[in-house]
Amino acid sequence: VTFSSPESISEAIKICHSNSIKVAVGNPPMDVALSGGWGVTCGFLDELLARGIDYVEISCIARAIDDGDLEKVILAAKQRNIDVIIEVGVEFAHSQSEDGNLFIERRIQQAKLALQAGAKMILVESEGLTENRNGQAYRWDVIDRIASNFPTEQLMFEADDQDVLSRYIDVFG
């Protein structure tokens, strides 16, 4: 559901493109499409293509997605000339995970697979790392462990406040 008309959305996308600005769609609509099965997912990707969307985000933490399905969706997006941003992290929304149960190596392997399948970028989700830590120290060690596996030009970071953003700029440029 959107409160903007299809025409106003199309006009905004045209303005972005005329100024060399790429347009992305975040994970929630893709998550809904994936829940609907392969036909719905392909239909959603076709709609993104028709609207001129440049990037789509696929989350590896908002839902369970196995490696084969992840690769299949990335390839389907690439066939439509839509670049993929893969979201990785340790928590989604306000879920709680214990620091000892983060499965970091699995997150890294899934991100590597996504890049090999054709994903353009890796987005490191802040939830549980620098956001919603309930007074506990930020998990810069986990962020470094994930990020050190990828070239900086293929990394994006979610930053929920100015201090976190400044730290990312200091460390990663």
List each language-model region with its residue ranges.
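Active-site-adjacent beta->alpha loops and helix N-cap segments on the catalytic face
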Residues: 3-16, 32-43, 60-85, 95-96, ...
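Conserved anion-binding
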Residues: 49-131
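Catalytic cores of alpha/beta
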Residues: 36-44, 103-115, 161-172
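C-terminal alpha-helical cap/extension of soluble enzyme domains
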Residues: 145-173
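Hydrophobic faces of well-ordered beta-strands that scaffold small-molecule active sites
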Residues: 21-27, 56-58, 84-88, 122-124, ...
